[in-house]
Curated annotation (Swiss-Prot):
SUPFAM superfamilies: Class II aaRS and biotin synthetases. One of its GO terms (molecular function) is ATP binding. Tetramer of two alpha and two beta subunits. PANTHER family: GLYCINE--TRNA LIGASE, CHLOROPLASTIC_MITOCHONDRIAL 2 (PTHR30075:SF2), GLYCYL-TRNA SYNTHETASE (PTHR30075). GO terms for cellular component: cytosol. This is Glycine--tRNA ligase alpha subunit. It comes from Bordetella avium (strain 197N).
Amino acid sequence: MLTFQQIILTLQEYWDKQGCALLQPYDMEVGAGTSHTATFLRAIGPEPWRAAYVQPSRRPKDGRYGENPNRLQHYYQYQVVLKPAPPEILDLYIGSLKALGIDPAQHDIRFVEDDWENPTLGAWGLGWEVWLNGMEVTQFTYFQQVGGLDCTPTTGEITYGLERLAMYLQNVESVYDLVWTEGANGQRVLYRDVFHQNEVEQSTYNFEHSSAEMLFAHFNDYEAEAKRLMEVPLALPAYEAALKAAHTFNMLDARGAISVTERAAYIGRIRNLSRAVAQAYYDSRERLGFPMLRNKAGEAA
């Protein structure tokens, strides 16, 4: 049986062999691996890029006080970004399942059409959910736009839901029963031991004790800071301010502090920031002469 951390190590080793830069998680609150600069910003422009990383993801509204067996406000994704998307991307994915000990000939693996959109990032793509014996474990996306900019060349994104994948591989019904690792003395460390208290307390904070007044003020401050930084222009610091605004919005949404009509307006404000950041980043890379294109040309020579 693969432990949770062995699943991560296996994926790291596999995608390392496919020429991916193995990066670290983005060190800010994000709702998905797509928000990491290694995906959102690197999907912009013509430069080639291959990367893989684990991303802790926060979705405050999905918290259930540690009482739901598969619903969490903090969870893990394993993200793979391939640009340009290679024609054999599906074969590469199947290869990763084989590395995890999953034989496609003995399992029901289905690709269910599910186009993807992230309104706050101004991003969308053609995609598929991957179902393994009836459980969704991965999302495939071919990005068409990011930050309102067309993706040329197309970026391929593979997002593994690590908890769901591990629940299948370990044959458990609750995420909290997952074996994180086998301790030095043979004692198992469970997902429950690592994260259950965090789910209880963070859910309590998100739903009951966060200050809406403070969060509204923070949102306005982060939005203003992002706009100010883009005038410099400093695309990367501006993007971090936009990410902070997005997480603050998610906290307000979980707190029930934003009405349905206000929600659409706030999403629009974040989307405007994302689009402005995307354009600023593209412009900055263009001024540099798209250096990774030169690197590729040098390798070809």
